[in-house]
C-alpha cells in the first residue's frame, strides 16, 4: 500500500569503466512528525515525483482517505455540494463549506487543498476566505478563472465565460498578500481548455497567474485523452508545478504524466461517487427485500463506524476524566409520593410501578450501581412499609 507520495524512482547511477549501473527503487515521502499541514502540502506538490490527492467531502471520508495511505486530500466542491444535496453552482454558501472543512481538518493529520471554486466573489472575498481557511488549518486553496456563481466544468463548458485575466490575477495577489503562513498554497486553475479557448489562451493565462504569485497551476481538460495536457506540458517547460484532474481521461497511465513532468494528480470525486452507488444499491435491496439478509454482509459493521469515530479514545478519556468508584458518591432517591395515577397507586407508591416486569425504583438503583454508585438512600413516605 502506498503510504506517501512517490519522490523518485531513480536513486543512483554508478559509472564504472566499461559499465553503467543504474539502481532503481521506489521511495515515498513521509510527513515529518510535527510538520505543519501547510508545509506538508507544499512539500508534496514541490516533490520531484508524482504526488496524489484523493477527494473527501466530510470528516468520515477524510479519515478513510488518510487511513488508505494518501498524503493529501482534495476538498472537492462538487462532492461537498453533492453531500449537502445541492448543485455545484455555489448553492452551498462558503461558510457552509467552511463548516464541512472544519470537521474534515479535525479528523486527519494530512493536509487539505480546498476546491475554492472562483473564490466566492472578488478579491475582497478571497482575502477573507484565506484568513478563514488558515484559522481552520486548511493547507491551501485552488481557485478557477470563471465567473461567480460557477458552473461545474463538465456541464456545458464551452458556454461558460472565463474571468477577466487581470481581475483573476488580482485575486491571486490578494490571497498571497493575505496569508499569514508562508507555506499556505494558492493554486490557479485554468479553464481555457474547458471553455474551448485552446492552448494559446491556456499558456497566456498560466504565465500571468504564475507571475501573480500562484504556487501551482491546475490545468483542466474534459477530453477523454490527454492531448490537452500533453500540449500544455510541452510548452510550459516546467516553469512551475502543474496539477491535473484526469476524471475524463482516466485510462491514460499515470506513468505518462510523470514522464511529462506533472507534479500532482487529483482523484477528484470518486469517494462521493462510490458512496452514491453503494447507498443506491443497499437502499434498493432493502426496499425490495423488506429484509437485511442480503445486505448485512456487504456493508460496514457498526463496530467499524465506532472505530472510525474514535470510540476507543473516548473510553480511555472517560477513565481518565470521569469520577471513578474510588471516589465516594452518595445518592438520594425520593420515593415518598403516591402520585395521582388512580387505581395504579391506590395501595402502593408510584416508585413501585413496574415497567417490563421491573419497578421504577429497582431500575433507578440498578442504573446507579452500573456507574459505580452504591451508597443510595431511599426516602419513603406513602405506603413506606411496601418499599
Which residues make up each language-model segment?
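Conserved N-terminal catalytic core of the sugar/cofactor nucleotidyltransferase
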Residues: 327-333, 339-340, 346, 353-354, ...
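Extreme N-terminal basic, low-complexity initiation segments
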Residues: 2-9
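Alpha/beta enzyme core
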Residues: 38-39, 51-53, 57-90, 94-110, ...
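Extended, intrinsically disordered, low-complexity segments
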Residues: 41, 270-326
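Catalytic-face loop-and-helix region of soluble metabolic enzyme cores
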Residues: 106-113, 233-291
Amino acid at each position: 500500500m502506498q503510504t506517501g507520495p512517490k519522490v523518485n524512482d531513480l536513486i543512483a547511477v554508478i559509472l564504472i569503466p566499461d559499465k553503467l549501473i543504474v539502481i532503481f527503487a521506489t521511495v515515498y515521502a513521509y510527513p515529518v512528525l510535527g510538520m505543519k499541514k501547510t508545509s506538508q502540502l507544499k512539500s508534496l506538490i514541490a516533490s520531484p515525483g508524482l504526488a496524489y490527492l484523493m477527494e473527501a467531502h466530510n470528516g468520515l471520508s477524510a479519515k478513510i482517505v488518510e487511513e488508505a495511505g494518501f498524503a493529501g486530500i482534495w476538498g472537492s466542491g462538487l462532492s461537498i455540494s453533492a453531500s449537502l444535496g445541492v448543485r455545484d453552482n455555489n448553492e452551498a454558501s462558503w461558510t457552509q463549506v467552511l463548516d464541512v472543512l472544519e470537521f474534515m481538518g479535525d479528523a486527519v493529520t494530512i493536509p487539505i487543498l480546498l476546491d475554492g471554486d472562483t473564490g466566492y466573489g472578488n478579491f475582497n472575498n478571497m482575502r477573507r476566505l484565506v484568513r478563514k481557511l488558515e484559522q481552520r488549518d486548511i493547507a491551501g486553496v485552488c481557485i478557477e478563472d470563471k465567473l461567480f456563481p460557477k458552473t461545474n466544468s463538465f456541464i456545458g463548458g464551452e458556454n461558460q465565460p472565463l474571468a477577466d485575466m487581470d481581475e483573476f490575477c488580482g485575486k491571486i495577489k490578494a490571497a498571497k498578500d493575505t496569508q499569514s503562513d508562508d507555506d499556505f498554497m494558492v493554486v490557479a486553475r485554468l479553464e481555457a481548455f474547458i471553455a474551448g479557448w485552446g492552448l494559446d489562451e491556456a499558456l497566456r493565462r498560466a504565465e500571468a497567474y504564475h507571475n501573480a504569485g500562484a504556487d501551482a497551476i491546475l490545468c483542466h481538460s474534459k477530453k477523454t485523452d490527454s492531448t490537452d495536457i500533453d500540449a500544455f506540458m510541452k510548452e510550459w517547460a516546467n516553469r512551475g508545478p502543474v496539477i491535473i484532474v484526469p476524471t475524463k481521461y482516466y485510462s491514460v497511465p499515470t506513468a505518462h504524466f510523470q514522464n511529462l513532468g506533472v507534479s500532482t494528480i487529483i482523484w477528484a470525486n470518486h469517494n462521493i461517487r462510490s458512496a452514491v452507488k453503494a447507498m443506491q444499491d443497499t437502499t434498493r435491496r432493502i426496499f425490495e427485500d423488506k429484509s437485511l439478509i442480503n445486505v448485512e454482509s456487504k456493508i460496514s459493521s457498526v463496530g467499524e463506524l465506532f472505530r472510525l469515530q474514535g470510540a476507543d479514545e473516548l473510553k480511555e478519556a472517560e477513565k481518565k476524566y470521569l469520577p471513578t468508584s474510588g471516589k465516594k458518591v452518595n445518592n438520594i432517591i425520593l420515593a415518598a409520593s403516591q402520585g395521582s395515577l388512580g387505581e395504579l397507586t391506590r395501595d402502593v407508591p408510584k416508585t413501585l410501578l413496574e415497567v417490563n416486569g421491573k419497578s421504577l425504583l429497582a431500575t433507578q438503583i440498578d442504573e446507579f450501581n452500573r456507574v459505580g454508585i452504591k451508597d443510595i438512600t431511599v426516602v419513603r413516605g406513602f405506603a413506606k412499609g411496601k418499599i
